[in-house]
């Protein structure tokens, strides 16, 4: 699932990723909420991975992040 927020040329992309971590003895399902943010004045992308326990938790965090950026920073949801 993805979410795109925009404010002028600045943008935030949120993506929920799930994968199986096979590095240990037993495979474990991992879920991440990935935030990619582009700032025009710096002309660079920043990335942040937020670990979650489940896809439902990742979806709740995605909604919280969306509400924060919309309410406090004036971003709007990009229509696809």
Name each model feature, range by range:
Residues 40-46:
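Short glycine-enriched loop/turn motifs at secondary-structure junctions
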Residues 44, 52-73:
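A short, charged, amphipathic alpha-helix used as a generic interaction element across diverse proteins
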């Amino acid at each position: 699932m993805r979410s795109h927020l925009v404010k002028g040329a600045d943008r935030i992309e949120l993506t929920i990723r799930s994968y199986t971590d096979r590095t240990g003895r037993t495979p474990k399902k991992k879920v991440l909420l990935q935030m990619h943010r582009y700032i025009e004045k710096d002309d660079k992308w920043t990335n942040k991975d937020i670990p979650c326990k489940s896809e439902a938790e990742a979806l709740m965090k995605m909604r919280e992040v969306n509400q924060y950026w919309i309410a406090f920073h004036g971003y709007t949801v990009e229509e696809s």
